Design a protein with these regions (language model features):
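Beta-propeller and closely related beta-sheet repeat lectin domains
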Residues: 5, 55-58, 105-108, 173-176
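Residue-level detector of Asp-centered blade-edge/turn motifs that repeat once per structural unit
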Residues: 9, 61-64, 111-114, 179-183
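Conserved beta-propeller blade signature
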Residues: 12-14, 66-70, 117-119, 185-188
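Short glycine/acidic-enriched loop and turn motifs that connect beta-strands
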Residues: 18-21, 75-76, 123-127, 192-196
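Short, solvent-exposed loop/turn segments at conserved positions within beta-propeller repeat blades
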Residues: 20-25, 128, 143-148, 199-205
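Loop/turn-rich, solvent-exposed surfaces of beta-rich toroidal or solenoidal domains
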Residues: 101-164, 172-173
Length: 228
C-alpha cells in the first residue's frame, strides 16, 4: 500500500492529483461526494498502475472545459470528459529548451491574458563564470547549486511551442499560480532545503504563498503587497 504522497493538488472538478513518494508514479483520485474533503476513490485510468510513471502530476482545465494532465516536466495528455482516464497518448510539450537541457520538474500549466503559461522548477547554479541554468560537466555540480527557481514560458497553444523561459521567482520553485476572489495573484512554494541560498536560512522545506504581479506579459513577486 502507498503510505505517503508528495506534490498533491486538489482541483475544483473534485479530483485529487496524488504522487507517491515511494516512486510509484502519479495517480488521480476522485471525490465520491463532490466535496474537496472526500472521501476519494481510484479512477479507472490508474486501477492497474499509475496513470503516469513519474512524479509531479497536475491538472489544467482550459476555458472550454477540456481538462489536461500535465506530468513531471515536459508531458501532457487530454483527459476524458468524465475524468476516468486519459483520452490520448501522453505527448511531449514543444518548448524552447536550454542547451543542454538541465533537469526540470514541477510542471504546471494555467491560462491568463490569452496565453498558456508553463511553470517549471529548475536549479540555478552559481559558478566562476556566472549564474546559469545550463548544466555543464566540469563547471556545475551539486555543490554549485544556488537557488531552486520558478521559471515560466508562454504559448498560444496548450501543446506549445512555448517561448523563451524567464525567471519568475528566485529560490521559490515548484509552484501553482492562482488568483484569489479579489483578483490578486499568488504562487505556492515549498522552499527546497538544498542549495547554497537555502543554507542561508534557519528554516526551510515549508509551504508558503508568494504574492505575485503580472506586468508586461510576465509574472514576478509583488514586494509591495500588504495584507488586509
Amino acid at each position: 500500500p502507498i503510505k505517503s504522497s508528495a506534490a498533491s493538488d486538489v482541483y475544483k472538478r473534485q479530483a485529487c492529483m496524488n504522487q507517491s513518494a515511494g516512486g510509484r508514479g502519479s495517480f488521480i483520485l476522485r471525490s465520491t461526494t463532490g466535496k474537496p474533503e472526500g472521501p476519494y476513490e481510484n479512477i479507472e485510468g490508474n486501477e492497474d498502475k499509475a496513470i503516469f510513471p513519474n512524479i509531479d502530476g497536475s491538472l489544467f482545465e482550459d476555458t472550454d472545459g477540456t481538462v489536461y494532465f500535465v506530468g513531471h516536466n515536459h508531458y501532457i495528455a487530454r483527459m476524458k470528459p468524465d475524468m476516468s482516464g486519459l483520452a490520448e497518448e501522453i505527448k511531449t510539450l514543444k518548448e524552447s529548451k536550454y542547451s543542454p537541457e538541465p533537469y526540470v520538474e514541477g510542471a504546471f500549466i494555467f491560462k491568463y491574458d490569452g496565453k498558456y503559461h508553463l511553470v517549471q522548477a529548475i536549479w540555478a547554479h552559481r559558478t566562476v563564470k556566472g549564474d546559469t541554468y545550463v548544466e555543464k560537466e566540469g563547471l556545475t555540480n551539486k555543490k554549485t547549486r544556488y537557488s531552486y527557481d520558478c521559471i515560466i514560458a508562454t504559448a498560444d497553444n496548450v501543446y506549445g511551442p512555448y517561448g523563451k523561459r524567464y525567471n519568475a521567482i528566485t529560490g521559490g520553485g515548484h509552484n501553482n499560480l492562482f488568483q484569489d476572489k479579489d483578483g490578486n495573484w499568488w504562487a505556492t512554494m515549498f522552499f527546497n532545503p538544498r542549495g547554497a541560498q537555502a543554507a542561508e536560512y534557519k528554516v526551510t522545506c515549508r509551504p508558503g504563498l508568494i504574492p505575485m504581479l503580472y506586468e508586461n506579459g510576465k509574472f514576478k513577486p509583488n514586494h509591495n503587497y500588504q495584507a488586509k
